[in-house]
A protein has these predicted regions:
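Acidic, serine/threonine- and proline-rich intrinsically disordered appendage/tail regions
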Residues: 2, 13-17, 101-134
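Solvent-exposed, conformationally flexible loop/turn segments
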Residues: 14-20, 61-65
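Short, solvent-exposed loop/turn segments enriched in Ser/Thr/Gly
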Residues: 17-24, 79-88
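Asparagine-centered strand-capping/turn motif at beta-strand->loop junctions
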Residues: 21, 25-33
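Short acidic, flexible loop segments centered on an aromatic residue
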Residues: 30-48
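Intrinsically disordered, low-complexity Pro/Gly/Ser/Thr-rich segments with frequent PxxP/GP/PP motifs
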Residues: 49-80
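Short acidic/polar inter-strand loop motif in beta-rich domains
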Residues: 90-100
Length: 134
């Protein structure tokens, strides 16, 4: 059984510096079992963060919401768009490790604030590519 979630930016980004933002994310666990969020990262070159570990992990009961904050680097000009950005979550679900990949489109408003739209969410078991390696 794989996790089912919805992830979206939870309100406006808050500036720490002109290119540094604290962004909140709402994670809705749509599954029938609890979801445990271990880590999150933003890997895109124009909308990025280091991996953030959650210690203790964030536990989200079935059919409930959780919230995380990630410090992101984004110095794009007002009016710019960043395509194919991602939020990647490392989670445990039903005693198995998973990656949740939320593909984002980032729009930079007229004040330089990034705002995301979630375009697609996929899940993959951790180690899935090793099964196909020779």
């Amino acid at each position: 059984m794989e996790p089912k979630v919805h992830i979206e930016q939870d309100g406006p980004a808050h500036a720490q510096r002109p290119d540094r933002w604290v962004i909140s994310w709402n994670i809705q666990n749509l599954g029938a079992a609890p979801l445990q969020v271990l880590a999150a990262r933003l890997p895109h070159g124009k909308f990025r963060s280091e991996e953030k570990l959650f210690e203790p992990p964030l536990d989200i009961p079935a059919n409930e919401n959780g919230r995380i904050e990630i410090k992101a680097c984004c110095g794009e000009a007002p009016g710019a768009e960043v395509e194919n950005a991602f939020v990647i979550l490392r989670v445990n679900y039903v005693a198995a490790p998973w990656l949740i990949l939320a593909r984002l489109r980032i729009r930079i408003d007229d004040r330089g604030k990034p705002a995301s739209t979630t375009e697609l969410i996929t899940v993959q078991p951790v180690g899935f590519s090793e099964r196909w390696a020779g």
